[in-house]
UniProtKB/Swiss-Prot annotation:
Main location group: cytoplasm
GO (cellular component) term, any one: cytosol
Keyword Hydrolase listed: yes
Cofactor(s) this protein cannot do without: NAD(+)
GO MF annotations, alphabetized: adenosylhomocysteinase activity
Pathway(s) where this gene product acts: Amino-acid biosynthesis; L-homocysteine biosynthesis; L-homocysteine from S-adenosyl-L-homocysteine: step 1/1
Organism: Xanthomonas axonopodis pv. citri (strain 306)
Function: May play a key role in the regulation of the intracellular concentration of adenosylhomocysteine.
Keywords: Cytoplasm, Hydrolase, NAD, One-carbon metabolism
Top EC class, one word: hydrolase
Family note: Belongs to the adenosylhomocysteinase family.
GO BP of this protein: L-homocysteine biosynthetic process; one-carbon metabolic process; S-adenosylmethionine cycle
Catalytic activity: S-adenosyl-L-homocysteine + H2O = L-homocysteine + adenosine
Protein name: Adenosylhomocysteinase
Amino acid sequence: MNAVTKITPHTDYKIADISLADWGRKELDIAEHEMPGLMSIRRKHAQTKPLKDVRITGSLHMTIQTAVLIETLKDIGADVRWASCNIFSTQDHAAAAIAATGTPVFAWKGETLEEYWDCTLDALTFTLPDGTLTGPELVVDDGGDVTLLIHKGYELENGSTWVDEPASSHEEGVIKALLKRVAVERPGYWGRVVKDWKGVSEETTTGVHRLYQIAEAGKLLIPAINVNDSVTKSKFDNLYGCRESLADGLKRAMDVMLAGKVAVVCGYGDVGKGSAASLRAYGARVIVTEIDPICALQASMEGFEVNTIESTLGRADIYVTTTGNKDIITVEHLQAMKDQAIVCNIGHFDNEIQVDALKALKDVQKINIKPQVDKYVFPNGNAIFLLADGRLVNLGCATGHPSFVMSNSFANQTLAQIDLWEKRDTYEKKVYILPKHLDEEVARLHLEKIGVKLTTLTKDQADYLGVDVAGPYKPDHYRY
């Protein structure tokens, strides 16, 4: 599609349709009521503005809930530029509502990969009063794309030849082409970006995995906070969020009756647990695939059959990948599936399913049914339905997680951004997790909304347990 672009002395944006702003604002108002943690943090810091004039780039699904996060960061002082972290996840009315307030946002549903990475660069590009192009001081990342781009750009300026190596995928080729272009158009740009960059907070399992890989290689340029492994993120967003949004995505995409169907959930981490619970709640017969014996045992103890993908071919109706790994469902698996099986992903990247290999098959007919629903017909007459082109089904085919559970995640993100900035001179170039007392505080902020009343320890009880009356109540090694 053709995005609407506007550049003025005060704001710039690339979105689908600015006329959707009023609709977006109405939904924002509803979401704020459902996001008590985020709104409480906004009220607490509205006067002190701990992020005053701090340049923040966000790369995170441009949804209504994210719009509430953006406005929270702005209300506590930040100078924000935003892009989505997925080509299909933007809610265009949410992007319009944010653009209408003067916040630069670069996102629309249905971007090409070239447009997506251009939008990421736009969100990264701040202009100083003297006209110099620079980057953010803090980053809110989801999947690690901004972190990857800055690191690869900086390495290129310091002698890396990675951009000249053959690309392993179409998307990698797009990234390399972008970096080559920036090298010509903005000499020394990435060095200026890194000089001012103070930290990143990462939302997802996939992005955190990238961060640890970079850190283990000794190449991490900044301190990073692993928001994903906060208990109030991973055990809520990943688990309870997926429990509601997976079925929502499947039903909006296919109008399918889940009861009685055989559904395969690939992976039984927190996302897999939520996905399996979602399908079982509707009456599906769920089979789990796993590599980890602990997760496999957990799934079995919950009553799920645990087996291999190969054992399900020809009998399963629905496949859902949740792993964060690549090549979980291969093109050979796709060709051997039951006729008209539904295939989707609720992990992060589309490489969990071999989508590129599917598209490259000879004599395969692709039929677009509606946006984000494609039917692939094989030469033998059998077909599969691929949802959201192998990207996130809950955001590509529906609206993602509900506001309340995202309030947990985004409260963590906001606290992480404040902590990174206030302690920017003490953090080392490592990956950190938010301290336990902040994790408990995020949970506490959401209790009143759902009518929860906490029991209070006596001083004697607290002394017996060796904790403070006000918490934290669990050691860091405790597994919830």
